[in-house]
C-alpha cells in the first residue's frame, strides 16, 4: 500500500497564535506531527504551509515542507495545490493529518489509508469510534456519522443521530443500548483526483447549515467510507490547555 501524508499547517490561529510553531519538548508542534506521521507506512510525509517560517522550522528538523498560497479557504484547498505542486498522479492516495495532532497514532494513519484502498468506489476515507455517552450524543461539538453496512457514510451531523425514538421519548437524554452511534474523527484519506476537483465544488446547503466541510463532497455525490476504531484518539491542540496536555504527554514519554 503506497500513500503520501500531507500536513496542512496554517500559521494564523485565533485561539493559539503561531500554533504550528508552538514548542513541544524542544521541537515545533508541526515537526512533532511530522515525526508521528513518519512512523506510519507512508511513502512520503510533506508539510503544506502558508508561511516561510513554518517551512524553515520543518527544514531545520529535517522535514520537507511546501509553501502554498496564503488565501486558501480550507485545508483541503491547500492540499489541492500541494498535490499539483508535487505532481502526484490522480490514482495516488493522500492522507490528511492535521498540523495540530502531535499525539496522532501512526497505526490510525495506516488504517484510514487501507480503508480507502479497500473501497475502489470511494473518493474519501475517514474514521469514527463509538460515542462515549449521552452527553457526547447531544454535544454539537461532537460530530456524529451514520454508516451503511459496507462502511459507506450516510450522513454527518452535529445533531444526535441516529435518533432512538423510544429511548428518547419524553425528552430523555440517554444513549440507547446498541445504538449504532459513531463519533467522527477528523482524519481523511483522499484520492488525488478528488483533491484536484475539490476547489471547484460549490458549498451546499447542508455544509452551510452544519458547518461540516465533508458534507460538500457528499452533496456532490462523492462516496466517503468510514474506518471504525474502538476508542477515540488523543484530541488535537486548539487551546493553551490542549497545548499543555500535549507537552505533558511528550515529557512523560522522554
From Swiss-Prot:
Family: Belongs to the KdsB family.
Record gene name: kdsB
Protein name from the UniProt record: 3-deoxy-manno-octulosonate cytidylyltransferase
EC number(s) stated in the UniProt entry for this protein: 2.7.7.38
GO BP, one annotated term: CMP-keto-3-deoxy-D-manno-octulosonic acid biosynthetic process
Transmembrane segments: none
Subcellular location: Cytoplasm
Protein's job: Activates KDO (a required 8-carbon sugar) for incorporation into bacterial lipopolysaccharide in Gram-negative bacteria.
Amino acid at each position: 500500500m503506497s500513500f503520501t501524508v500531507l500536513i496542512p499547517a496554517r500559521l494564523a490561529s485565533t485561539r493559539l497564535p503561531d500554533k504550528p510553531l508552538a514548542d513541544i519538548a524542544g521541537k515545533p508542534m508541526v515537526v512533532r506531527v511530522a515525526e508521528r506521521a513518519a512512523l506510519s507506512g507512508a511513502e512520503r510525509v510533506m508539510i503544506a504551509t502558508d508561511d516561510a517560517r513554518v517551512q524553515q522550522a520543518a527544514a531545520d528538523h529535517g522535514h520537507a515542507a511546501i509553501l502554498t498560497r496564503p488565501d486558501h479557504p480550507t485545508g483541503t484547498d491547500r492540499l489541492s495545490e500541494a498535490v499539483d505542486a508535487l505532481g502526484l498522479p490522480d490514482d495516488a492516495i493522500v492522507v490528511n493529518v492535521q498540523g495540530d495532532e502531535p499525539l496522532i497514532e501512526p497505526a490510525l494513519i495506516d488504517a484510514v489509508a487501507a480503508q480507502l484502498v479497500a473501497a475502489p468506489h470511494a473518493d474519501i476515507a475517514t474514521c469514527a469510534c463509538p460515542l462515549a455517552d449521552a452527553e457526547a450524543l447531544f454535544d454539537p461539538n461532537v460530530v456524529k456519522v451514520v454508516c451503511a453496512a459496507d462502511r459507506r457514510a450516510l450522513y454527518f451531523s452535529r445533531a444526535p443521530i441516529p435518533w432512538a425514538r423510544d429511548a428518547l421519548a419524553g425528552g430523555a437524554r440517554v444513549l440507547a443500548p446498541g445504538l449504532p452511534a459513531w463519533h467522527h474523527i477528523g482524519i481523511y484519506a483522499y484520492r488525488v483526483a478528488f483533491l484536484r476537483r475539490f476547489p471547484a465544488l460549490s458549498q451546499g446547503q447542508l455544509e452551510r447549515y452544519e458547518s461540516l466541510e465533508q458534507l460538500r463532497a457528499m452533496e456532490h455525490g462523492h462516496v466517503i467510507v468510514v474506518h471504525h476504531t474502538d476508542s477515540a484518539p488523543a484530541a488535537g491542540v486548539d487551546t493553551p490547555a490542549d497545548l499543555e496536555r500535549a507537552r505533558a504527554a511528550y515529557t512523560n514519554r522522554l
